[in-house]
Amino acid sequence: MKVVHCESIPLAPVQIEGAVGAKVRCLIGEQDGAPSFTMRQFEIAPGGCTPKHAHAHEHEVFVLEGTAAVLMGNAEHALQPGTAVFVPPNVVHQFRNTGSSPLKFLCLIPHPLRGMSQTCVAACGCE
């Protein structure tokens, strides 16, 4: 079992080409004995974004703070606190902070990370 306050885990820059002002912390993952999912918290600066990308695994997102737009395929959707997002496998997606304060969201991804290289996993802060 693990009980931790998110702010006790340092934020690390997302080191993937196309990421702007994006940081991540791995809250719970395989290293903690979680057999099925990794829970990450992202923080994106105003005007920042995650890279536009796709991968073989799904993920689920829950917006905690800020306003954003998510691009999924050719559609863009506005996000606000309390919004949940399901990103299916192999769909091109990107999260952009459209507000004037930091965007914070939780992102859950499954194990194993099908289609995600170890380099990409490390760049997202969850080795």
Predicted segments, located by residue:
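Conserved short histidine dyad/triad with adjacent acidic residue
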Residues: 40-55
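A short, N-terminal "cap"/entry segment at the start of jelly-roll beta-barrel domains
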Residues: 1-36, 120-127
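Ligand-binding loop in jelly-roll beta-barrel domains
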Residues: 33, 89-115
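Short acidic-glycine-tyrosine-enriched beta hairpin
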Residues: 75-89
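Short beta-strand His + acidic residue motifs that chelate non-heme Fe in jelly-roll/DSBH
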Residues: 50-52, 70-71, 87, 93-99
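Glycine- and acidic-residue-biased ligand/ion/polar-headgroup-sensing regions
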Residues: 57-59, 63-68, 73
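Well-ordered beta-strand scaffold positions
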Residues: 42, 67, 75-77
